[in-house]
């Protein structure tokens, strides 16, 4: 699969990220780097530990990475989760985290399919 096909599969905004990164090879490079980003595992762990502060930081980081890479499919639920956690509560966090997880898995699967 091409990187453009990857973005299409995950429902992300390839054209937007192309404006920022200028080339398909740069997009591919940074998308692959996302596979080693630790913000999602930190978010998952922090939520299990009910550590709102750490969960907020991890969600905020993940949100920023998604925005920079044009992963709009993952950005939106991560944004919503970040706002829930910003209020200092876990109320509603599980539901948003479930949506984040769904989109995260779609994103990871699509990136791994890039040749």
Task: Give a label for each model feature.
Residues 3-5:
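Intrinsically disordered or compositionally simple regulatory linkers and C-terminal tails
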Residues 11-61, 91-115:
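Long, amphipathic alpha-helical coiled-coil segments characteristic
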Residues 1, 23-24, 71-75:
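Short, structured coil/loop segments at alpha-helix boundaries
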Residues 39, 51, 55-58, 66-86:
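Short, well-ordered alpha-helical segments
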């Amino acid at each position: 699969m091409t990187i453009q096909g990857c973005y299409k599969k995950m429902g992300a905004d390839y054209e937007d990220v192309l404006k920022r990164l200028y080339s398909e090879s740069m997009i591919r490079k940074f998308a692959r780097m996302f596979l080693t980003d630790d913000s999602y595992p930190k978010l998952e762990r922090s939520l299990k530990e009910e550590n709102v502060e750490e969960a907020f930081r991890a969600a905020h980081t993940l949100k920023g990475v998604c925005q920079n890479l044009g992963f709009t499919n993952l950005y939106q639920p991560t944004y919503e989760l970040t706002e829930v956690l910003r209020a200092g509560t876990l109320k509603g966090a599980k539901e948003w985290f479930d949506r984040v997880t769904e989109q995260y898995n779609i994103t990871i699967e699509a990136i791994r399919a890039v040749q």
